[in-house]
Amino acid sequence: MKPLNTTIVLAAVVSLAALVPLRGNAQDAYSAYLLPSAAASAPCDNTDFLKDQQKFESGQLTQDVLENVCGTVTYVYPKKHTTSGWHGYFLLQLSAGNVIEIVSDLGQMNAPAWPWVQIGDSATVRGRYYYDNDSSQGIDWTHHGTSSSWTTPGYVVVNGTKYQ
């Protein structure tokens, strides 16, 4: 009976190992395999984002770019009314010392009432990275809508729930 139990445990370990990619971080594995709503979503690429951020800071990049980032929510602001409607803002920590503001157009999002994100939540975000200066930068267009100036829809996945 013991060899059978060992075989079952070994088979389970091998099966689980097949689900985890050999490269990438735990968030990538989580997003890729455990989030059905995010399965069709682009994987997060914090490294690419940080490279783009450095390019903006040095003047090598001047136009907004599409980014896919993931991390932990560290702060949630109250909703704010702007000239383009109600927006929700939160800070997403990508890695130690790297935090970016996420902007969501609440009128465009298919989401519950704000705040639908809380401190400590895991989030994956796809949207437009804008950089005006060191203190004015963030990721917006995190919703399904597009315009003539930005043609790529975005989204936010919070703890496995996708909002567009």
Language-model region placement:
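Bacterial N-terminal signal peptides that target proteins for export
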Residues: 1-9
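OB-fold and OB-like single-stranded nucleic-acid-recognition modules
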Residues: 26-164
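Bacterial N-terminal signal peptides
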Residues: 10-18
